[in-house]
Amino acid sequence: MGAKVKVAVVQAEPVWFNLQETVKRVNELIESAYNKGAELIAFPEVFVPGYPTWIWTNAADLDRNLMYTKNSLTYDSPEFISIIETVKKYPIHVVLGFSEKDQGSLYISQCIIDNTGEIVLKRRKFKPTHVERVIWGDTADSNMKSVVTLNFKEAGPVEVGCLSCWEHMQPLLYYNSAAQHEKIHIGSWPALNDKDLGVYCFTKAGFHGLARAYANQVQSFYLFTSILGQRIQEALPDVKLSPYFEKGAGCGAVFAPDGSQITEDHPDDFDGVIISELDMDKILLQKNLVDIVGHYARPDMVSLSHNRPNTEFVNRK
């Protein structure tokens, strides 16, 4: 048995589209995870302030889109500062998924806050999916960094990274994470429905299939965190939701580097954190079999190229 890392995967409901109340929920979940002995907590995609599910039936709802913009999070806001203060009070590494407001634009963002309260990684979703592009923009950052090194009590320094939702459909993105020697991966997902409505990749089994494949191919632990959507219709009483987003089921889970699920399934209405202990030797065992950025690679034949275009709005020469 190797060194252990105890983690907390959030399967919880936000206070839908209410920035201040959802940040309070974030702080409560951080405290809960810390009190359960976790050293890292992983939050779903845009947990703050919740996923705007109406875009899948009425993306041109300008009033709601404005409301959503006003309830999105900025790094310099009192709400974000309160999260930092909570981390300092309850020292735990945090991977936060949120709708980021930057001036007049929104982005699907993730950040990693270490257990001292320092922001050690900021990233934005590479490309919003389908109708998400009505609300959120592409990242304009040419920096492909998605992994940082965090320190844990028993395991010492460990590479931790994150991606959002269908970024896990992008093989080059997870190869990029593998090339940064990621050991613990956080996959942040929105409210998901466990019904099979004819599109398998929109089911729990389909989403978990992506997670299993990622864990196996990158040889990392995969923390699957998704928003609980039991009360989403109550928050949008006059909206006809897409059947894919009605009463979203909790899909929280942890997958080992061989793709096996190491947490039990929780009820659809379980609201809280799922605790799991990771045995870091499992990574070494899997790497011994296959290492796609090591002994099982041929960079002399196949490699990933990363373009670094200019992303400045004004260039002064």
UniProtKB/Swiss-Prot annotation:
Gene3D superfamilies: Carbon-nitrogen hydrolase
Xref: Pfam families: CN_hydrolase
Domain of life according to the entry: Eukaryota
E.C. no: 3.5.5.1
GO terms, molecular function: hydro-lyase activity; nitrilase activity
Catalytic activity, as annotated: a nitrile + 2 H2O = a carboxylate + NH4(+)
Active site: 45, 125, 165
Domain CN hydrolase: from-to ranges: 5-280
Keywords: Hydrolase
InterPro entries, per the entry: C-N_Hydrolase, C-N_Hydrolase_sf, Nitrilase/CN_hydratase_CS, Nitrilases_CHs
The protein's role, per its UniProt record: Nitrilase that hydrolyzes preferentially 4-cyanopyridine. Is also able to hydrolyze some aliphatic nitriles, such as phenylacetonitrile.
Family listed: Belongs to the carbon-nitrogen hydrolase superfamily. Nitrilase family.
UniProt name for this protein: Nitrilase
Species the sequence originates in: Meyerozyma guilliermondii (strain ATCC 6260 / CBS 566 / DSM 6381 / JCM 1539 / NBRC 10279 / NRRL Y-324) (Yeast)
